Amino acid sequence: MTVVLIVAATRPQLAVLADSVRTFHELGAQVHLAGTFHLAPVSKELTAAELDGVRQLPRSVRGSSALRRKAAESPTGMRVWLQATGDNWLRAQARKADVLVALDSKAVYTVWRLAQHNRGAEALYGITPALRAVEALRDRGDAAPRRGMRDSLPSAAVVARDVRRSVSGLPAVVMRTATARPVMRSAVGARLWRGAVTAPGVPARLRVSASRYVAEGMESAGRTSGAAIALAAAASKVGDLGIRASLLDESVMKEISNGLVPGKLPQAVAAQLAHADDRFTRGDFPEAATALNRALTLNFHRVVHIDQLSSPLARKAGAYVEPLYASKVMRALGAPRGRRTPHAPAPTGRPLRLLVTTSGNANFLHHILSHFGDHPGVELRFLDLAAQKSLMRISWAGRRILEDRLAGDATDYQEEVERLIRPYLDWADTVFLDWAVGPASMLTTIDPGDTRIVVRLHSYEAFTRWPHSTDFSRIDDLVFVAPHVRDLVASLVPQLRGEHAPRTHVIDNAMELAGFARPKPAEARFRLGLIGIGQVAKDPLWAIEVLRLLRKEDDRYRLSLVGGDMSAKTSHATRDYLQRFEKKLAPLVKSGAVERLGATDDVASALTGIGTILSSSVREGCHVGLMEGAASGALPVARDWPFYAGRPNSARTLYPEGWVVETPEEAAERIRRHTGTEEAWRKAGAAASAHALTAWDWPVVRTHFERLFLGTE
């Protein structure tokens, strides 16, 4: 027989209750009623209703003064539960029940709590859903009831009323109790609260407050996406542009902070842009800049583009930034201001004054600085912007840069950049800025006068916000390290496709490769090498799969990993990848199949024992490690970098035919084919070394830089 337990906090319409009990009986069910309302005055009516059991639950909270204070401060639903929770009869009946019914909205929380101890029971709100459930149980015979509470939620009006009453002025500790981890772990509790934050008629202030408590509870319960959904749902009911943008920002950051790419990211960016447009139209440039700053930060967050094995920019770059440039603020930001006078030609009666600058990353400048530092036609100075606090501060001041542009170059930031940077511009004939990040945006804030501005963009920058706040009309020459990077950036930044675009060049990174060509021992034939594993984009798991396929047929193959490890502190997404990688790696290191060489300043020596050099990355500019390995005489095997595969320019157009493969299976096949004999392996390595030295060695690349800076060979 089906057992129904009805819980009521307020006196029901007794005639309706009696009719319902008769219907339950006709369906073969027993019906028990437990109420916190005063049963004694209506005892005759309850007896006439022929209930199978009636229980008067405590009408007030019993216990310590602290518990009574908590009850007094709690929402009505929780207060009912605190009254009833200690009743043994109620708990016993709840464990036996097939259907648990909340007769009114105040009893919903109590029924939900009881259902946590009887997972097989239906937990419902209202008599009609309960009758349907009992009828379904009868029709199914002995079949187990189906869990669910689609009909259990109170009406929107009831929820709105309760939320207004409960949230207004409620202490934070009480709200946190109502949205605590046990509640939010349940689909029922989570759905109940999501319904509450979207209920109609709730004032914006209360809706925002409630949604944040709900999100906090869901996140604590491990429902990260649920927390994001709750905040986004509340945002959809808020009319204020600033509040809506703030809630959607919080929503997507819940997921980003956990290494996830948010589903609501386009909506969050659009909300910030709408808020920015509104403030910009009203002349509120500081607030417009703040909102635009958040839009750019979210749109180009590293968790979305850098710490993943894919990116929206790798799929449809133009479509991804189209909504961004449809906004008023981005059109204002992207308007080219140009320079008042063209840059002066290189001097003829004295050496060229060349200022080479970067901010903390001079990794690719050593050969340039060494060569031009000794060049008779060049007077060289080097400026590391990160070495001076004042220059560091203005170089990465993203929001201030935006505000200055939106305000028409009329802020104190403009004055500060003029004061700090103008002396360097006045001295230099040519400025060469490495990395198109914050300093490029800062430098193009002011007119460069007649100084020539040259900026180099590697690969990383394409996936950041910085090209979108740089005024390329004030840059004379833009240097890319590879054609596929040039193509991607041009598709992202409208200024690079307009009449004010700078001249573009493709010049390889400066590498001294001749010293890598050293003899290799015969046993290196079976040693694979991967140089650089410190980023998710390097995807060393791909290299592990290549090794697995090779060792399946010949266990002489080994893998050496050269370079520092990824940092789990970079982001949650990086940590997740690192955990997967370490799990795969541990048994291979233990067995000797993989050797971790760690970071080294002498890559050339490490390469003497490596016979095959891998590029397993999902994206690269020009993979220096692969080029160094090829120069050493190792067999090059490069993955067709997925971010660029199939495009007019990619790894296949950067490297000679045959070097690039699509899958680990193709990589393993290429390695087997060229390492089958020592003669074949050495022949392939010699050909690779010859190509590397004639195409990428510094004496070759140096001529391109001399032409760039001096107009000579």
Q: Could you say what each language-model-derived stretch is?
A:
Residues 1-2, 131, 136-198, 204-205, ...:
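Non-catalytic membrane-proximal stalk/linker segments that position and tether the catalytic domains
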Residues 354, 521-538, 544-551, 559-560:
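Conserved donor-binding/catalytic core segment of Leloir-type glycosyltransferases
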Residues 465, 476-503, 511-513:
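A short, active-site helix/loop in glycosyltransferases that binds the activated sugar's phosphate group
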Residues 515, 676-709:
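A charged, aromatic-enriched C-terminal amphipathic alpha-helix characteristic of glycosyltransferases
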Residues 573-599:
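Nucleotide-activated donor-binding/catalytic signature segment of Leloir-type glycosyltransferases, i.e.
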Residues 618:
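Aromatic "clamp/platform" in nucleotide-sugar-dependent glycosyltransferases that forms part
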Residues 635-645:
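Short hydrophobic beta-strand element within catalytic cores of glycosyltransferases
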